[in-house]
């Protein structure tokens, strides 16, 4: 055992003789020399005089855009805030310490400018991890702490879901003002070298700006504008396209026949479906009264159109079920809706086929009835006009005056034939009056049915007119609502 002890000591001496051990000893000695309590106090600002400004260079690196909560108006990001300044007390001559030029020191042992996120939304102002600071031999200090920031973000819902937001991250020292430190931008924009793309937002620009207040010389801050644009595919698939399809169902209302009885049911069903979508939107966007979201405007627009279709359906049904006993068709209605509008609306009314005797037959029947009535009124001598050449009970010889007791060649008394012909004339007259009544009644029914068909045709023309109005207004309204947000431009806010 004693013989092995010299060998161990020799090995330790050999290892310490290597460069690594010398460097380790040099860094340890340098750490002790720099952070000696009699020489360095991490609570004191590294300034040679009380009037000297310590310049703090800031550079933001965006690692990930975690989320944007529209309802709570909070943006969550994963950032690295690079801070650089010069501390003359941490400078050394590298030749005296084995050529050591860089030294890593725990952040709690050196002075920090206590720069925090001013527009913090969760009350946690500390960084996620207090990493070491990197100190160089010339006294320059670099600190790159990672942080999960939850910042307040004013959400503009005007163009939702085709919106573009400008969320800001404002950094400022918590205890030092502009008379003690000066915050400057190392680069005009934030870095995205290590950025992980987001599935919901596109990064448009990340400009930074230094803000001072001329009226307050002690104020200075550095603000980064996160100009982000939403990827609308999710909301297009789940909100906009279903709304458009449901709205297009309202067009079918104008194609449903009025006798179907389902026009009002379809209209109200579409209206209820749009109301459900409106309730879904209210749970996504913030409850603000400053602006109405674009999708909300579209839903309200479609709800107005569907309500209009309900009103028009009521009017069309009212016109469709009119009859001559309740309404009289005005001449301007006939002229406008039966002759002029159908041509412009590409409607051609089919030619109506008469289902009963034509008007000329009815006229001949009426004329024959009048002739028969006159003949019967004139007596038996004119009955030949009714029966043509038939001489059943009247012959030409009866025209001459004879004795009332005379008999014909058959031996039948002539007064008996006259009495028989009088009873026959009465029966025929009653039969003809019945036929005339039936003919007039059928004619009246045909006229009433023709008027009813005219009212139904007017209802169809009105329905087609409202259909074209609905389609034109729906298309123009949809294009007018969704087209402007696609070409919107956004400029960073210049407010301090």
Curated annotation (Swiss-Prot):
Cytoplasmic face of the membrane: 258-265, 320-464
Extracellular side: 20-236, 287-298, 486-496
InterPro entries with a match to the protein in the record: Neur_chan_lig-bd, Neur_chan_lig-bd_sf, Neur_channel, Neuro-gated_channel_TM_sf, Neuro_actylchol_rec, Neurotrans-gated_channel_TM, Neurotransmitter_ion_chnl_CS, Nicotinic_acetylcholine_rcpt
Membrane topology label: Multi-pass membrane protein
Positions bearing the site annotation: Key residue that facilitates effective access of the conotoxin BuIA to the channel binding site: 82
Disulfide-bond pairs as recorded: 153-167
Annotated compartments: Synaptic cell membrane; Cell membrane
Transmembrane portions of the chain: 237-257, 266-286, 299-319, 465-485
Function according to Swiss-Prot or TrEMBL: Component of neuronal acetylcholine receptors (nAChRs) that function as pentameric, ligand-gated cation channels with high calcium permeability among other activities. nAChRs are excitatory neurotrasnmitter receptors formed by a collection of nAChR subunits known to mediate synaptic transmission in the nervous system and the neuromuscular junction. Each nAchR subunit confers differential attributes to channel properties, including activation, deactivation and desensitization kinetics, pH sensitivity, cation permeability, and binding to allosteric modulators.
Name of this chain's protein: Neuronal acetylcholine receptor subunit beta-4
């Amino acid at each position: 055992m004693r013989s092995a002890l010299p060998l161990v000591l020799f090995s330790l001496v050999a290892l310490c003789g290597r460069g690594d051990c010398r460097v380790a000893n040099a860094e340890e000695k340098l750490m002790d020399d720099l952070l000696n309590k009699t020489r360095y106090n991490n609570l004191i600002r590294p300034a040679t005089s009380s009037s000297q400004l310590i310049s703090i260079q800031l550079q933001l690196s965006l690692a990930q855009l975690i989320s944007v909560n529209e309802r709570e108006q909070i943006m969550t990001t994963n950032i690295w805030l690079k801070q650089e300044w010069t501390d003359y007390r941490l400078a050394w001559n590298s030749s005296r310490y084995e050529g050591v030029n860089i030294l890593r020191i725990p952040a709690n042992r050196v002075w920090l400018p206590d720069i925090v996120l001013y527009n913090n939304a969760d009350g946690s102002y500390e960084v996620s991890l207090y990493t070491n600071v990197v100190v160089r031999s010339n006294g320059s200090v670099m600190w790159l702490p990672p942080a999960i920031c939850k910042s307040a973000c004013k959400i503009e819902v005007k163009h939702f879901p085709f919106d573009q937001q400008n969320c800001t991250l404002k950094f400022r020292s918590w205890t030092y003002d502009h008379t003690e430190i000066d915050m400057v931008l190392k680069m005009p924009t934030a870095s995205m070298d290590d950025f992980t793309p987001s599935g919901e937002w596109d990064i448009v620009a990340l400009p930074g700006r230094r803000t001072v207040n001329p009226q307050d010389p002690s104020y200075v801050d550095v603000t980064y504008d996160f100009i982000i644009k939403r990827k609308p595919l999710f909301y297009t698939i789940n909100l906009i396209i279903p709304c458009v399809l449901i709205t297009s169902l309202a067009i079918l209302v104008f194609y449903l026949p009025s006798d179907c009885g389902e026009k009002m049911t379809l209209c109200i069903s579409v209206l209820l479906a749009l109301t459900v979508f409106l309730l879904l939107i209210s749970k996504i966007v913030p409850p603000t009264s400053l602006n109405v979201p674009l999708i909300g405007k579209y839903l309200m627009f479609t709800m107005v159109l569907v309500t209009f279709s309900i009103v028009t359906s009521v009017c069309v049904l009212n016109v469709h079920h009119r009859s001559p006993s309740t309404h009289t068709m005005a001449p301007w209605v006939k002229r406008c809706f039966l002759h002029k509008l159908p041509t412009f609306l590409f409607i051609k009314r089919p030619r109506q086929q008469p289902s009963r005797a034509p008007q000329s037959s009815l006229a001949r029947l009426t004329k024959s009835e009048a002739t028969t009535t006159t003949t019967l009124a004139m007596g038996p001598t004119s009955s030949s006009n009714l029966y043509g050449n038939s001489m059943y009970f009247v012959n030409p010889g009866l025209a001459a005056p004879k004795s009332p007791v005379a008999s014909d060649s058959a031996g039948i008394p002539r007064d008996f034939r006259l009495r028989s012909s009088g009873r026959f004339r009465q029966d025929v007259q009653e039969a003809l009056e019945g036929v005339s009544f039936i003919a007039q009644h059928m004619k009246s029914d045909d006229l009433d049915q023709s008027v009813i068909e005219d009212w139904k045709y007017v209802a169809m023309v009105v329905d087609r007119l409202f259909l074209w109005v609905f389609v034109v207004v729906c298309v123009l309204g949809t294009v007018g609502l969704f087209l402007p947000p696609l070409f919107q431009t956004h400029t960073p806010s210049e407010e301090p």
